[in-house]
Each structure stands twice: as C-alpha cells, then as structure tokens.
C-alpha cells in the first residue's frame, strides 16, 4: 500500500472537518434537537394534563348535574306535598263553610216556617171568630169567645 501525500492531506482535511463540525456545527444541532424534544415532551405532558382535567371536569359536571336533579326532585316533591296540603286545607275549609251555610239556611228556614205557622194560626183564628160571629150574628160572651178561640188556636 502506497501512502502518498494526497491521501494524507485528505485524511488531515477530513479530521479537521470532523473537529470543526464537532466544535461548531454539532452543538447547535444537538441543542435544537433537545429543545424540540423538550417542547414535544412538554406538549404531550400538557395534553395529558388537559385530558385528565377534562375527565375531572366531566366527572364534576356529571356529579353536579346529578345533585341538581336530586335537588330539583326534592323541590318538586315538596311542592307537590305543599299543593296537596293546600288543597286538603281548602277542601276542609270549604266543607266547614258549606256546613255552616247549610246550618244557617236550615235555621232560617225553620224560623220562617215557625213565623209562617204562627201567622197562619192568627189568620185562622181571626177567620174562625169572624165565621162564628157571622153564624151566631152576635157575640154571646167575650170571655167565652176568647176561650173558644184559644182552644181553636191550640188545636191548630
């Protein structure tokens, strides 16, 4: 093998080129690659955190929705109970009012009936006395007539 100056010059030039690249070209390339790797790793970590946060937010929203539905159901049940209670109270009050009005009306009817009966008795007594006077055409005795009228009124 023949070593000549050209091969030796090329070898020295290649070694110098490699040293130059290792000194000035390689570090910025490695720094750029490491920076890009770090950005990608940070992006992936951020995406993972965002995904976990999203899952937590979904779970929290689901829990809050369940709680809100439960509270709404409780409120609806309370409103229904209150509505039933108000209706029952109104029915009871209406029944009491109806009973009171019926009793008052019956009392008024009874009083009117008694008054009408008494008025009728008085008119019958007057008609009986008038009829008796016309039949007899004269009064026998005022005391006897009043006894007869009282007996007649008592019989009615």
From Swiss-Prot:
F-type ATPases have 2 components, F(1) - the catalytic core - and F(0) - the membrane proton channel. F(1) has five subunits: alpha(3), beta(3), gamma(1), delta(1), epsilon(1). F(0) has three main subunits: a(1), b(2) and c(10-14). The alpha and beta chains form an alternating ring which encloses part of the gamma chain. F(1) is attached to F(0) by a central stalk formed by the gamma and epsilon chains, while a peripheral stalk is formed by the delta and b chains. F(1)F(0) ATP synthase produces ATP from ADP in the presence of a proton or sodium gradient. F-type ATPases consist of two structural domains, F(1) containing the extramembraneous catalytic core and F(0) containing the membrane proton channel, linked together by a central stalk and a peripheral stalk. During catalysis, ATP synthesis in the catalytic domain of F(1) is coupled via a rotary mechanism of the central stalk subunits to proton translocation. Component of the F(0) channel, it forms part of the peripheral stalk, linking F(1) to F(0). Keywords: ATP synthesis, Cell inner membrane, Cell membrane, CF(0), Hydrogen ion transport, Ion transport, Membrane, Transmembrane, Transmembrane helix, Transport. GO terms for cellular component: plasma membrane; proton-transporting ATP synthase complex. Its main location: membrane. The gene is atpF. Gene3D superfamilies: F1F0 ATP synthase subunit B, membrane domain. This is ATP synthase subunit b. It comes from Escherichia coli (strain K12). The keyword Membrane applies. It is found in: Cell inner membrane.
């Amino acid at each position: 093998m023949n070593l000549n100056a050209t091969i030796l010059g090329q070898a020295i030039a290649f070694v110098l080129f490699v040293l130059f690249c290792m000194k000035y070209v390689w570090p910025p390339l490695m720094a750029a690659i490491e920076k890009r790797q770090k950005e990608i790793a940070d992006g992936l970590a951020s995406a993972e955190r965002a995904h976990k946060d999203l899952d937590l937010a979904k779970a929290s929203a689901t829990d809050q929705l369940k709680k809100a539905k439960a509270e709404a159901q409780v409120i609806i049940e309370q409103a229904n109970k209150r509505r039933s209670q108000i209706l029952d109270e109104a029915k009871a009050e209406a029944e009491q009012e109806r009973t009171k009005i019926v009793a008052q009306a019956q009392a008024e009817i009874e009083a009117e009936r008694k008054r009408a009966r008494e008025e009728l008795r008085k008119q019958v007594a007057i008609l009986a006395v008038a009829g008796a006077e016309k039949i007899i055409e004269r009064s026998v005795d005022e005391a006897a007539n009043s006894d007869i009228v009282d007996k007649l009124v008592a019989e009615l």
